Every structure is written in C-alpha cells, then in structure tokens.
Amino acid sequence: MSWRADILTLFPNMFPGPLGFSLAGRALERGIWSCEAHDLRQHGLGRHRAVDDTPFGGGAGMVMRADVLDTALSALPALDGRPVVYPTPRGRRISHEDAERLSSGPGVVVLCGRFEGVDERVLEKHDIEQLCMGDVVLSGGEIPALTLLDACVRLLPGVMGSDVSGQDESFADGLLEYPQYTKPAVWDGRDVPDILLSGNHGAIARWRHEQSIAVTKARRPDLWDAYLARQQVH
C-alpha cells in the first residue's frame, strides 16, 4: 500500500503542484505515494459555501468554522492511523525527526488554514497536530503543506537514488550539512579544498564532519546545543 496524503484546502489546484516534479513527481507516478486534495468549499454553508465567520470576542479577520472543518474531516476515507496535521505559526517547529516519523507511517492528512486560522474546538476534537515551518507568517497553509509533504516523501523507500544521500543531509545526524563542491576544480579564482581531491576517504569524512560542526555552531547554535546534549546522553 502506498503512502497516502490527503489535503483539506480552499485551493485544491495547488496540489500536487511542485510535488509533481523531480523526486516526488517520479515517486507519485510509480505509486510510491498518492496525493488527493479536497476542496473545503464543498462543505461550506449556504449559497456562497461559506467556510468562515467573524471571531467571537472581536478582532480583525475571519476564522474557519469548526462545523465545516469537522464535516470535511469526517468525509475523508478511513484515516487508518494517519495523523492530521495543521500547519500554523502557533505550532511546534517541525524537525527532521517529525518528517521521519510521519514518513514511516501510512500517510498524513494536512488541514490548510486561511484567514486568521481555525476554530480551536475542531483542533481539540480531532487531536490535530500543530506544526510550524518557521518563525514567519504566510497567507495560508498550502505552502507549508507542500513543504511538509516533500520532506516526508523524499524519505520513503525507493524515492531517493541512494540511501546514503539521506544519511549525509542536514539534520540527519543532528548537524547541518557540510559544504559541497563539483567541477570545475578551479572557478573564478576559487579552488576546491585539496582534501576533497586527495582520494583519502577517511580524511574526507573527518573534514566533512568538522565542517558540519563549524557550520552548525555558526548558523544554528540551538541545533549545536541539542547535538551536544545527545552526545552526553550516549
């Protein structure tokens, strides 16, 4: 059975979007995963298929209605253990471990919010997992949903050409990835580091690890602290 993604959205034509190309697109064609977008307007209320209303307590914007979202979720095929994820700036920041966890299961359902967000009650009723792509606010949940799905799909067996590709990437061992180089060996007066041309695989591995440490320390001190903490545990 393939890994299944169902997306609840006001803009179903955004899917699979970029996921129809490259690694994810080829995996989609091969049946490694499947993707179906469901139009929330189909469950909207009244002549205008309304999916939102004004917030209780006042305030700007509109809030997506719990009853509409509940109906949409209930209309989905059996979840079969698939978690429902809601991308939101209020959520816990997503990690590589989240992508590994989600990709190891039967699939995922993604609820894409719009406006000022969704009624809290539907999140509580369906025990929806709230994840954040970063400390930034976007216009809706569709782009974060694409990001989440891409992060998961590329980890599915048979998607990447080499299992080593995934093992060496940023976050796979808790560190950011080392710098990469390709031909030509000299470009614009800049040389590829000699160690990478040496053929000494042990020395190259050590250099790459040192570079990963340096990059992580400089750019993501939070990741570096977490990495050190894990090393102390083990």
UniProtKB/Swiss-Prot annotation:
Ranges in coiled-coil conformation: none
Positions contributing to S-adenosyl-L-methionine binding: 113
Keywords from the UniProt entry: Cytoplasm, Methyltransferase, S-adenosyl-L-methionine, Transferase, tRNA processing
Protein name: tRNA (guanine-N(1)-)-methyltransferase
Species the sequence originates in: Gluconobacter oxydans (strain 621H)
Task of the protein: Specifically methylates guanosine-37 in various tRNAs.
Gene Ontology biological-process entries: tRNA N1-guanine methylation
Catalytic reactions of this protein: guanosine(37) in tRNA + S-adenosyl-L-methionine = N(1)-methylguanosine(37) in tRNA + S-adenosyl-L-homocysteine + H(+)
Listed PANTHER family: TRNA (GUANINE-N(1)-)-METHYLTRANSFERASE
Source organism superkingdom: Bacteria
